[in-house]
Regions:
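Structured segments of extracytoplasmic/periplasmic soluble domains
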Residues: 129, 133, 165-168, 204
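Amphipathic N-proximal alpha-helical interface segments
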Residues: 86-113, 147, 151-184, 237-246
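Extracytoplasmic/luminal low-complexity segments enriched in Pro/Gly and acidic/polar residues
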Residues: 185-246
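Surface-exposed beta-strand edges and their flanking turn/coil or helix-capping segments
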Residues: 33, 162-163, 188-191
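Preferential activation on post-signal-peptide N-terminal prodomains/segments
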Residues: 1-137
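Acidic, serine/threonine- and glycine-rich low-complexity intrinsically disordered segments
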Residues: 119-154, 159, 209-213
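A cross-family detector of function-defining hotspots
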Residues: 71-93, 141-156, 216-225
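Residue-level detector of short, conserved catalytic/binding motifs and their immediate flanks
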Residues: 9, 163, 234
Length: 246
């Protein structure tokens, strides 16, 4: 059956790739064209359509990262030097068409002022303020065209990171929410390839479909208490659905 085919294929490919890894000292190893062709063929048998142009072409060794998030108390101390209760978000704050400022999207800094997006210039000023207040902003990249910032570490996205800020009529911060890591500490390095993650495609997308995007990044896991770990993962879009394969 399809599952057996995929499992058998993965075993063969893993043995093949281990040989390649053994003869290279680089952190990145190129996947041969014939391996990619075979993988795409197996995926088609499992109900997935994928273009060769978006199939990942390499095996990459990435470290995990251990961290803690800024708490509400941390945010209050950073901004005001004392404990201040941020106002509960007004239910009337609704994202308008073309504005993602009040919707938490992957990798974005988010800004809102009522139902109107804060200008890109104002957003940039807010981020400068965050840096002055002590936020770890390493790897933050500003997308001028989109008007938001996203988070990168060693050239790879940290999924589901955001800082959301709303301003009152006087331009003062009246609401703030963040899922943003403090300083990251490198952990165990893990070799990750999309071929090894193929066996998780069917459980994640039982109906199959067209794979539109594959992106390497980090998913978040709780390590107990206030501690968290970012682990290398694939963010896969099949048709209009997005799943993270660890």
């Amino acid at each position: 059956n399809i599952k057996s085919i995929m499992v058998g294929f993965l075993i063969v490919m893993n043995l093949f790739m281990l040989g390649i890894i053994a003869v290279t000292t680089k952190q990145q190893s190129i996947v041969p064209e014939e391996v990619i062709d075979s993988a795409i063929s197996v995926m088609k048998e499992s109900g997935f359509e994928i273009g060769k142009d978006i199939f990942p072409k390499s095996y990459v060794a990435l470290p995990s990262y251990n961290t803690q998030f800024y708490s509400a108390s941390d945010l209050s101390e950073l901004f005001f030097g004392k404990q201040v209760a941020f106002r509960t978000k007004d239910k009337s704050l609704v994202a308008t068409e073309g504005s993602a400022v009040l919707t938490v999207n992957n990798n974005h800094f988010l800004y809102g002022s009522g139902s109107t997006a804060v200008s890109s210039g104002s957003a940039y000023s807010l981020v400068k303020t965050l840096k002055k207040k002590g936020f770890d902003m390493k790897g933050a990249v500003y997308d001028k065209e989109a008007g938001y910032f996203y988070r990168m570490y060693n050239g790879v996205n940290l999924f589901n990171m955001f800082i959301e800020v709303s301003l009152d009529s006087d331009g003062e911060i009246c609401y703030m929410k963040a899922q943003w890591p403090k300083k990251l500490v490198s952990g165990e390095r893990k070799r990750i390839s999309f071929i090894e993650s193929m066996q998780k495609l069917n459980p994640a997308f039982p109906a199959g479909g067209k794979i539109k995007n594959i992106e390497l990044g980090y998913s978040l896991k709780s390590a107990g208490g206030e501690k968290f770990t970012f682990t290398p993962s694939w963010r896969v879009q099949v048709d209009d659905q997005i799943r993270i394969l660890e």
